[in-house]
């Protein structure tokens, strides 16, 4: 009986005792209360005859003696008061004469009885002043008892649950050792003989047959008998034969493996080792010891051996006889499916034997056994894949138990083997060297997936002389798939259609991979990176290195050009100006006294440039000189476009006619409002014409204005041709003809105002900044020529070159500033011409050109729609244009 069940029985036996103890304590309390006052005959006296149910009711406070109600009053009244009975050991006092009360028949009594009601046995009326025993005390006693019972039940449940968990852990721990009885196991586990015929033991032909039947044996889960002959380090052999299953109907037995000694005896035969079943207690004790000496039963790295077996596994022994109890857990199948430890070789001496009861083997020749020895290294333990356990377990353990109940017999057996080996019995041949790489087919089987396909052979292109072509730099393009159902230009091109042949030597020299050169460059860069000292900040140093590569000139050429003041292009000067260091970096480079080769090439280049007086200011004025003419030409062209746009807007009659049509149409639309009767409007109202739509949802007010202008132009053109007066009551067909004739005239407005569109893209602030930059550059050039370099005679060439340019730049800047003032004046006059006032913000002086440009875009769109539409909706003329 388990410990949990014992605890439960003890708690259940203690609980009634506690309840009875509470009842006895209550009885004693009642007895003490009854000694002071005898209850009347109707009351219940505390005696030994008090029933169990009455005690329980008194404990719970359910047995109260209360007086009855008024309606039962006459039945509860006694004819005469009677004293309470006195115990026999006390002397009786004379009772007073009873007063006889004669109740009236049929009439209820109107007076209440003055006789005290019968008291409960727990009341005391003597001088001691004892009161009723508190009900809370009684309830507390009951609650305490119930709590003890509940506590006992909870402890029992917790113990049962803990015992179940412990059983589960033990079951998992002994799962490799204990498989249950024959009735509880599956048929596949109890079946001793495999459905597949096993090969004859210790023959080479059987090994070949086993290798052929290996895939079938892998899928079969019923074959449980195996014989493993492995090579122990230093020439030791281990042969594990089929295991015998001992069934016991009364208790679970342990499956044990029996081994057969396979040493080379002088008798030339292998004797049968009788099966000895070890005691169940011994197995359990060893299993418990095994669990105590290891942290986890699922650990795949432990290995338990008996002392005798361990002592016999010495390098001097040539054979190993498994005659003592051995519990072995192999390291071959860890949780991580290590391919090297789990790989199987079909030629590793595996034998399948079908044994029922006792085992009989014939002795195999020494030569055959030497061939069948394991070929894997001693550090690896390899097992066939058909006997692998389920990989879903946390760690796979293979236990070989070789049972023998007596340790003395194992020692005798070992001594007998030692004597036989010392008598000169020939030793078996040494095993062959271990196999480095397992076969690929078994490697794929071990991982549970097919082996990967072999890599495709690389196609080596061969030239005309038969030598392999070297690899060149690739040309990255996108291949086009050939379309068999479509004719393409590539179908007419053949590889042999070229009239010329490649110059292989030239293409190799130009585009071949220079692996050695690149490696040398990398090594040189690494060496310089480890030995150089950086003065310039890292990010700026990288930019300087990139700019240095774009110069396409050496240091001496750059220095000579800077000294002379010419000879460098705009791109080179821009790169040199960007290399300008900060003041701190300039001081560090000038004060650097170490080895110049220790500096970075870019830093070394900048250091050489700093040796020239005013090197970077020279570069800046040289760049200013090269860009001066281009900047001035761009500014003058912008000024010319602005002047042309002002002239076009003032002189365009078509634009004036359009403004007239919009003014008349707007006044008609604003009749009856404050906006009506206008004589002028701002040009931004032209953009609002496209927002007002007609009832059809398509025609806008701009459509209407353009059609009327086109009709008016067409009518005038027709009058000039026919010299007939026009009529105000023209038919709709005639109006359509006039409109189609005048649409071309209206669309010409966009061509007349061509400069207006260009000026709209000009930013006046940008023009002003350009002129300001030119003025600042001119001032810097003047300071450099007149002050900084005037005292040095070595700079004569540079000064002469810059002085001539200085005079030209000063005259040009004076004319440019005059043009700027004139252009701004013309823009102000144009703004006043259309708007009547000039905005205070001078940055919006060109806003009028932007408005006209947007309106011309809307006008061109309407004209295209009118040309494309043949059947336009007829519009009635509201205001004829005169």
UniProtKB/Swiss-Prot annotation:
* Pfam families, per database record: FH2
Membrane topology, record value: Single-pass membrane protein
One Gene Ontology cellular component annotation held by this UniProt entry? cytoskeleton
- Residue ranges annotated as compositionally biased, kind Low complexity, are 298-308
Show the SMART domains listed in the entry.
FH2
| Localisation per UniProt entry | Membrane
One of the protein's GO biological processes: actin cytoskeleton organization
The GO terms describing molecular function are: actin filament binding
What InterPro entries would the database entry show? FH2_Formin, FH2_Formin_sf, Formin-like_plant
- Keyword set includes Metal-binding: no
* Protein name per its UniProtKB record: Formin-like protein 9
The top of its lineage is: Eukaryota, Viridiplantae, Streptophyta, Embryophyta, Tracheophyta
């Amino acid at each position: 009986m388990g410990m949990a069940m014992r605890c439960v029985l003890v708690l259940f036996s203690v609980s009634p005792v506690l309840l009875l103890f509470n009842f006895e304590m209550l009885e004693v309390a009642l007895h003490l209360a009854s000694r002071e006052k005898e209850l009347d005959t109707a009351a219940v006296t505390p005696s030994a005859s008090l029933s169990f149910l009455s005690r329980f009711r008194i404990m719970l406070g359910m047995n109260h003696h209360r007086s009855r109600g008024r309606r039962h009053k006459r039945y509860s009244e006694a004819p005469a008061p009677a004293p309470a009975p006195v115990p026999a050991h006390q002397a009786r006092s004379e009772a007073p004469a009873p007063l006889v009360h004669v109740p009236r028949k049929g009439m209820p009594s109107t007076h209440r009885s003055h006789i005290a009601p019968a008291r409960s046995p727990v009341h005391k009326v003597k001088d001691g002043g004892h009161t009723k025993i508190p009900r809370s005390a009684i309830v507390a006693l009951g609650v305490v008892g119930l709590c003890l019972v509940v506590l006992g039940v909870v402890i029992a449940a917790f113990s049962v649950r803990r015992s179940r968990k412990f059983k589960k852990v033990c079951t998992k721990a002994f799962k490799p050792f204990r498989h249950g009885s024959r009735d509880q196991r599956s048929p596949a586990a109890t079946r001793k003989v495999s459905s597949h015929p096993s090969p004859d033991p210790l023959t080479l032909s059987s090994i070949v047959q086993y290798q052929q039947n290996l895939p079938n044996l892998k899928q079969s889960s019923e074959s449980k008998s195996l014989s493993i002959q492995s090579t122990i380090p230093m020439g030791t052999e281990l042969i594990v034969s089929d295991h015998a299953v001992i069934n016991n109907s009364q208790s679970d037995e342990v499956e044990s493996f029996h081994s057969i000694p396979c040493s080379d005896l002088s008798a030339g035969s292998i004797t049968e080792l009788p099966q000895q079943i070890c005691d169940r207690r011994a197995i359990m004790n060893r299993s418990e010891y095994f669990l105590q000496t290891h942290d986890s039963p699922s650990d795949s790295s432990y290995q338990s051996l008996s002392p005798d077996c361990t002592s016999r596994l010495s390098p001097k022994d040539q054979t190993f006889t498994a005659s003592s109890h051995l519990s072995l857990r192999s390291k071959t199948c860890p949780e991580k499916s290590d391919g090297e430890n789990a790989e199987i070789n079909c030629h590793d001496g595996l034998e399948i034997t079908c044994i029922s009861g006792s085992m009989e083997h014939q002795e195999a020749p020494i030569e055959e056994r030497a061939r069948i020895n394991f070929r894997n290294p001693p550090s690896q333990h390899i097992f066939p894949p058909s006997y692998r356990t389920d990989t879903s377990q946390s760690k796979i353990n293979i236990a070989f138990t070789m049972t023998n109940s007596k340790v003395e017999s194992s020692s005798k057996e070992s001594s007998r083997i030692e004597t036989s080996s010392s008598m000169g019995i020939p030793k078996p041949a040494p095993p062959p060297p271990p196999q480095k790489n397992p076969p690929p087919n078994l490697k794929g089987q071990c991982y549970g997936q097919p082996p990967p396909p072999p890599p495709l052979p690389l196609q080596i292109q061969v030239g005309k002389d038969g030598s392999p072509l070297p690899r060149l730099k690739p040309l990255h393009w996108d291949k086009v798939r050939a379309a068999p159902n479509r004719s393409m230009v590539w179908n007419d091109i053949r590889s042999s259609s070229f009239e010329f042949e490649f110059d292989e030597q030239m293409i190799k020299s130009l585009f071949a991979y220079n692996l050695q050169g690149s490696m040398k460059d990398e090594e040189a860069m690494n060496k310089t990176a480890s030995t150089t000292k950086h003065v310039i900040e890292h990010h700026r140093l990288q930019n300087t290195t990139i700019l240095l590569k774009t110069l396409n000139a050496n240091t001496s050429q750059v220095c000579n050009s800077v000294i002379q003041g010419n000879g460098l292009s705009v791109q080179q000067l821009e790169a040199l100006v960007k290399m300008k260091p900060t003041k701190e970096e300039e001081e560090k480079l000038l004060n650097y006294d170490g080895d110049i080769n220790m500096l970075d090439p870019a830093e070394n280049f900048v250091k050489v440039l700093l040796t020239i007086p005013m090197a970077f200011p020279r570069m800046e004025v040289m760049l200013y000189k090269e860009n001066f003419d281009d900047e001035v030409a761009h500014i003058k062209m912008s000024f010319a476009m602005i002047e042309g746009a002002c002239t076009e807007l003032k002189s365009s009659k078509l634009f004036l006619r359009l403004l007239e049509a919009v003014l008349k149409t707007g006044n008609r639309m604003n009749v009856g409002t404050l906006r009506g009767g206008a004589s002028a409007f701002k040009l931004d109202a032209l953009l609002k014409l496209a927002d007002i739509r007609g009832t059809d949802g398509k025609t806008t007010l701009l459509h209407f204005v353009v059609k009327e202008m086109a009709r008016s132009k067409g009518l005038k053109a027709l009058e000039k041709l026919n010299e007939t007066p026009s009529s105000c009551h023209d038919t709709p067909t005639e109006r359509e003809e006039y409109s189609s004739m005048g649409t071309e005239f209206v669309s010409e407005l966009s061509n007349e105002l061509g400069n207006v569109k260009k000026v709209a893209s000009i930013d006046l602030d940008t023009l002003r900044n350009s002129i300001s930059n030119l003025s600042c550059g001119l001032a810097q050039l003047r300071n450099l020529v007149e002050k900084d370099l005037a005292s040095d005679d070595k700079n004569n060439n540079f000064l002469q070159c810059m002085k001539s340019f200085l005079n030209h730049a000063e005259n040009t800047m004076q004319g440019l500033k005059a043009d700027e003032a004139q252009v701004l004046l013309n823009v102000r006059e144009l703004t006043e011409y259309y708007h009547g006032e000039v905005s205070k913000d001078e940055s919006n002086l060109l806003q009028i050109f932007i408005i006209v440009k947007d309106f011309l875009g809307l006008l061109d769109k309407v004209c295209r729609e009118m040309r494309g539409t043949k059947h336009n909706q007829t519009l009635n003329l509201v205001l004829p244009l005169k």
